[in-house]
Amino acid sequence: MTNKEFAQWVYDSSGKLDIDPIFVTAQAVLESGWGKKRIGKYNIFGITKGSWKGKTLLIKTTEIHKTAKYAYFPPERVESVTELPGGKYRYVVPRLFRDYDSLEQCLLDYISIFKKPHFAHAWEYRHD
């Protein structure tokens, strides 16, 4: 899929949601490297398992934390920690990511994140 095809795919699918499709498309492009680094077929935002009860994939990733003692829970586990400038640490760790059955399922889940208390203040700007 070309960059243009990926952007059109996301834009067309997100046009049905109550949010500006340009915002959703831009975020998907950044998070997935134009769809080249998506998780499974449809996780274009790199959304981790969290409280998800659906299918998951265990994928090695890099995380940045402010402590050298960050803990993960099995099956996630720290493979390596590297100290970075500024008191931060780079972790290499297999993480559980949500494995969606469709792009629409991913988009609806992504939108639901903005409705949670932590991001609720951003929801009012979804058409800007």
Where do the language-model regions lie?
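Catalytic cores of secreted/periplasmic lytic hydrolases that degrade extracellular macromolecules
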Residues: M1-D128
